[in-house]
UniProtKB/Swiss-Prot annotation:
Substrate binds at residues 96-98, 127-130, 137-139, 185, 317, 322-324. Its EC number is 4.2.1.2. GO terms for molecular function: fumarate hydratase activity. One of its GO terms (biological process) is malate metabolic process. This is Fumarate hydratase class II. InterPro entries: Fum_hydII, Fumarase/histidase_N, Fumarase_C_C, Fumarate_lyase_CS, Fumarate_lyase_fam, Fumarate_lyase_N, L-Aspartase-like. The keyword Lyase applies. Involved in the TCA cycle. Catalyzes the stereospecific interconversion of fumarate to L-malate. The active site is at H186 (proton donor/acceptor), S316.
Length: 464
């Protein structure tokens, strides 16, 4: 069953149970591309804008109070998730996001008209353009929704997940701060380090990435709303930009403000490009952590085997008993995806031709995907890998004892050249450092014991 809806192009049949109208239906027909739906976070952000605009327009006397109440009631239902199925449009549509903006306008109007007893859909008493979209344009609504959805995702999903992983690693670092092991540079044996020190480096890297993300947020809090079509504010009343930013801040609990220059806010997306760069930084940190832990966990008998990673599932369909570092692999894969997303975001953000960037949907699709992947990845990795990993102290001690770079402790006492001679002799002849040093006559047994002490090689000033 269907009903007839109309727009400036003419009549079109719309499913009878749909709240949307003609423009949404045309988009469904004309853009049957892929299956990547416009993120619900964007659609809910657009809905929040409609609610805020109705309040501001009501206060300004630009919207009848009864119409404003109907819009707000319908918007609240959308924000509650009651009508998520009414947003079927894909990312691959007009680059301004106009069709998704109209999808929201039509759904809110269609539900508001039903609440008013006029049946589902239609344009009376609530009109999708004249009332729901009053004082707005898709060109300022959509970039505003992009910023709202992004800020909410970062604050509600990503930052708590980073804190969770950082806390998990910090707990492991504190627990193993005195467990001495071989350090490695260039993938080769180096001077000693503790497992706790190694993990503390991960925590510091996460802290840096988190600070970069937080530093990008103030620009994301700046909203394009009020710029309307080209940034001039045509058809928006004086003071509307400031008023709706304040209303959105109150409704969301986030410190949104009006963008100081609406022309840049419509034509450029530097704030989201900058945030994406920070997300890429976090992805790089997670890649390093995942790679290091799977290297340390390699084995169990023919690898480093210094860390036992939790066994989440059987690892092979052909090799019985094999267990793989799957959490590390998943984390590193999503990091690759985020890095790829950043390339797309950076290119799309550069396409602000004249007064409007028309790559907005692909930008926000990738930004929100990156945030979601990073948030889920941090939480999942902490729960299923970091929390259950355990160091193999015996294996660490074995590698430390066999390591040749302990010879570095002799540099201040016998000099670099003699120390290098000891290391080379030990390596080529299969000797221990002690055996090589004594054979060369460079020091006594007692001096070796006094000077080569791994637990004293862990901080500045050691063996000076």
């Amino acid at each position: 069953m269907s009903r007839t809806e109309t727009d400036s192009i003419g009549p079109i049949e719309v499913p009878e149970d749909a709240y949307w109208g003609a423009q949404t239906q045309r988009s469904l027909i004309n853009f049957a591309i892929g299956d990547q739906r416009m993120p619900l976070a964007v659609l809910h952000a657009l809905t929040l804008i409609k609610k805020a605009a109705a309040r501001v327009n009501d206060r300004n006397g630009d919207l009848p109070a009864d119409i404003a109440r109907l819009i707000e009631q319908a918007a609240d239902e959308v924000l509650d998730g009651q009508h998520d199925a009414q947003f079927p449009l894909v990312v691959w549509q007009t680059g301004s996001g106009t069709q998704s903006n109209m999808n929201v306008n039509e759904v809110i109007a269609g539900r508001a008209n039903e609440l008013a007893g006029q049946g589902r859909g239609g344009k009376s008493p609530v009109h999708p353009n004249d009332h729901v979209n009053r004082s707005q344009s898709s060109n300022d609504c959509f970039p505003t929704a992009m910023h709202i959805a992004t800020a909410q995702a970062v604050k509600e999903q990503l930052l708590p997940a980073i804190a969770e992983l950082s806390s998990g690693l910090a707990e492991q670092a504190a627990r193993h701060m005195k467990l001495v092991k071989t350090g490695r540079t260039h993938m080769m044996d180096a001077t000693p380090i503790t497992f706790g020190q190694e993990l503390s480096g991960f925590v510091a890297q996460l802290d840096y990435a988190e600070k970069a993300i937080r530093a990008a947020l103030p620009a994301v809090y700046e909203l394009a709303q009020g710029g309307t079509a080209v940034g001039t504010g045509l058809n928006a009343p004086k003071g509307f930009a400031e008023a709706i930013a304040a209303e959105l801040a109150a409704l969301s609990g986030l410190p949104f403000v009006t963008a100081p220059n609406k022309f840049a806010a419509l034509a450029g997306h530097e704030p989201l490009a900058a945030l994406s760069g920070a997300l890429k930084t976090l992805a790089g940190t997670l890649m390093k952590i995942a790679n290091d832990l799977r290297l340390l966990g390699s084995g169990p008998r023919a690898g480093l085997a210094e860390v036992r990673l939790p066994a989440n599932e059987p690892g092979s369909s052909i090799m019985p008993g094999k267990v793989n570092p799957t959490q590390c692999e998943a984390l590193s894969m999503l990091a690759c995806q985020v890095m790829g997303n950043d390339v797309t975001i950076g290119f799309a953000a550069s396409q602000g031709h004249l007064q409007l960037n028309v790559y907005k949907p692909v930008i926000i699709h990738n930004v929100l995907q990156s945030i979601r992947l990073l948030a889920d990845g941090c939480s999942n990795f902490n729960e299923h890998c970091v929390a259950g990993m355990e160091p193999d102290a015996e294996k660490m001690a074995e590698h430390l004892e066999r390591g040749l770079m302990l010879v570095t402790a002799l540099n201040p006492h016998i000099g670099y050249d003699k120390s290098a001679h000891i290391a080379k002799k030990a390596y080529t002849e299969g000797l221990t450092l002690r055996e090589a040093a004594l054979a060369l006559g460079y020091l006594t047994d007692e001096e070796f014991d006094a000077w080569v002490r791994p637990d004293k090689m862990l901080e500045a000033g050691s063996n000076g």
